[in-house]
Amino acid sequence: MRSIRKRWTICTISLLLIFYKTKEMARTEEHQETQLIGDGELSLSRSLVNSSDKIIRKAGSSIFQHSVEGGKINSSLVLEIRKNILRFLDAERDVSVVKSSFKPGDVIHYVLDRRRTLNISQDLHSLLPEVSPMKNRRFKTCAVVGNSGILLDSECGKEIDSHNFVIRCNLAPVVEFAADVGTKSDFITMNPSVVQRAFGGFRNESDREKFVHRLSMLNDSVLWIPAFMVKGGEKHVEWVNALILKNKLKVRTAYPSLRLIHAVRGYWLTNKVPIKRPSTGLLMYTLATRFCDEIHLYGFWPFPKDLNGKAVKYHYYDDLKYRYFSNASPHRMPLEFKTLNVLHNRGALKLTTGKCIKQ
């Protein structure tokens, strides 16, 4: 009996030691996850997820103070980043599947929900590009325009439009906000959810006409539709495809490759930036490194207030609310922003979060 109690005591002590050792290892891994490697190393403190107000109060003397005007672009760093990203993906190829990738009737699994499948329709197949829309494209300067309300009253429109190539997100309206956001659109993303949110789900002819008019303004720009991410938006994608074909719109459609989002996430995780799913803005920056010598970011500000404590809308064009620090969010936008700000300070990109300087 005494020997049995002794064995139980030893087992209990061993289990406790394993438990505490595992806990300590997890704590160490968590700490290591929060380091951005390279020069200008950034410690991603817990305050990032605890309170936006704390971050903004720190901003005056820390991470945001250089975000309005940047210095010169560090060309060697830009090339280094491009080379490293090419180890994970080639934006020229992965920006879109092409017609030869599938045939009508093929069944594919959704990227973020492998249990669900999608049939490649005739309309979808007919709109797939023959070759990548970014094949052999190269630009001196590019603008990636996010949709934060920080753009309002920024007077950045002319500066944005002056870039050789302008990337916009989620089919955001531009004409009525031209002074702040510009109107040039060379590449524009459109999540399927935009159909419901901005165009009433095409419930009536007026909604459809509004959508067709918006696309007609794009001319031969690239319309990038993430059609293979998750189930739920397939009917919206089909409606969009049908309207493009019916109205013979000149827009050039593109549909991201099935590996793109995992490849982008893999690059950032390898560089110790523990994102969940990359936001559209981070995705577009990552792609742009392939074909842009200089990348300028506008409309990136994932906080409810600016540096002066003034309220900032989630989108410059609507009243949609967003909980930036919610664990339920698929994105970690404040973390992404802080990472991009480090790259700004190192000269890898230019991040504008205030008024643009008139030329």
UniProtKB/Swiss-Prot annotation:
Q: Which cysteines are joined by disulfide bonds?
A: C142-C292, C156-C356
Q: Which residues form the signal peptide?
A: none
What is catalysed by this protein?
Answer: [N-acetyl-alpha-D-neuraminosyl-(2->8)](n) + CMP-N-acetyl-beta-neuraminate = [N-acetyl-alpha-D-neuraminosyl-(2->8)](n+1) + CMP + H(+)
Give EC number(s), comma-separated.
Answer: 2.4.99.-
InterPro entries with a match to the protein in the record: Glyco_trans_29, Glycosyltr_29_Sialyltrsf, GT29-like_sf, Sialyl_trans
Entry binding sites for CMP-N-acetyl-beta-neuraminate:
N147, N170, S279, T280, G281, W301
Q: Where is the active site?
A: H331
- Give the location in the cell: Golgi apparatus membrane; Secreted
**Residue ranges, Lumenal compartment?**
21-359
Glycosylation: residue positions: N50, N74, N119, N204, N219
**Chain ranges passing through the membrane:** 8-20
Entry GO CC: extracellular region; Golgi membrane
Q: What is its main location?
A: Golgi
Q: How does it sit in the membrane?
A: Single-pass type II membrane protein
Provide a GO biological process annotation: sialylation
Q: How is it modified after translation?
A: Autopolysialylated.
Q: Which UniProt keywords apply?
A: Disulfide bond, Glycoprotein, Glycosyltransferase, Golgi apparatus, Membrane, Secreted, Signal-anchor, Transferase, Transmembrane, Transmembrane helix
What enzyme class is recorded for this protein? transferase
Per the entry, what this protein does is: Catalyzes the transfer of a sialic acid from a CMP-linked sialic acid donor onto a terminal alpha-2,3-, alpha-2,6-, or alpha-2,8-linked sialic acid of an N-linked glycan protein acceptor through alpha-2,8-linkages. Therefore, participates in polysialic acid synthesis on various sialylated N-acetyllactosaminyl oligosaccharides, including NCAM1 N-glycans, FETUB N-glycans and AHSG. It is noteworthy that alpha-2,3-linked sialic acid is apparently a better acceptor than alpha-2,6-linked sialic acid.
Similarity comment:
Belongs to the glycosyltransferase 29 family.
Protein name as annotated: CMP-N-acetylneuraminate-poly-alpha-2,8-sialyltransferase
**Gene name tied to this protein:** ST8SIA4
